[in-house]
Amino acid sequence: MASLNDSHFDLFDLPAQFALDASALDHAYRTVQAQVHPDRFAAAGDAQKRIAMQWATRTNEAYQTLRDPLKRATYLLHLRGIDVGAHENTAMEPAFLMQQMEWREGIEDAAAAKNVDALDALLTELRDEERMRFDKLGALLDSGANQAAGEAVRQLMFIERVASEIGTQIERLDN
């Protein structure tokens, strides 16, 4: 069995890359989880139970990270020695900053007008932008452009926050 210190990719015997076969990840997760599930160690001693729990927790964390594209990209960059620094490094290219302001204004205007259709349209626009940026992120990671990939991750984190904010506004208006 792998070591608790192995990478998430090594744990599931998957290549350390952004593009990931979701069904292969799911299969690998189920295989590892079946081996380490604490129920298999119910009759074991306390030390073995504790180790099984550590493995189960580690397996779940690895799976949750790899199945989410943004977390997977952040993790890949971490493995490459790049700290995305989303909280400290908020500098973004001017065009993206302008786009951010437009999205925020659109949210404010639609929420003030109680216009759920406008919020839905904005959410669709954001999801389209997100898909395009994930494609770009994959290419950046594949080419080893790690600094640019870090910038792309920060932008995608922002897009996710804005999309969540739109969802909250839609929910508020629907109630």
Swiss-Prot record:
Q: Which GO terms describe its cellular component?
A: iron-sulfur cluster transfer complex
Q: Which UniProt keywords apply?
A: Chaperone
Which InterPro entries does this one have? DnaJ_domain, HscB, HscB_C_sf, HscB_oligo_C, J_dom_sf
Q: Note the Gene3D superfamilies from the entry.
A: DnaJ domain, HscB, C-terminal domain
Query: What would you give as a GO molecular function for this chain, any one?
Result: protein-folding chaperone binding
User: By its UniProt entry, which Pfam families does this protein fall under?
Assistant: HSCB_C
Q: Which family does it belong to?
A: Belongs to the HscB family.
Lineage in the entry?
Bacteria, Pseudomonadati, Pseudomonadota, Betaproteobacteria, Burkholderiales
Which PANTHER family does the record match to this protein? IRON-SULFUR CLUSTER CO-CHAPERONE PROTEIN HSCB (PTHR14021:SF15)
Q: What GO biological process, any one, is recorded here?
A: protein folding
Function, please? Co-chaperone involved in the maturation of iron-sulfur cluster-containing proteins. Seems to help targeting proteins to be folded toward HscA.
What is the protein's species of origin? Paraburkholderia phytofirmans (strain DSM 17436 / LMG 22146 / PsJN) (Burkholderia phytofirmans)
Q: Partners and quaternary state?
A: Interacts with HscA and stimulates its ATPase activity.
Q: What is this protein called?
A: Co-chaperone protein HscB homolog
Key word Chaperone present in the record? yes
- Tell me which residues make up the J domain: 7-79
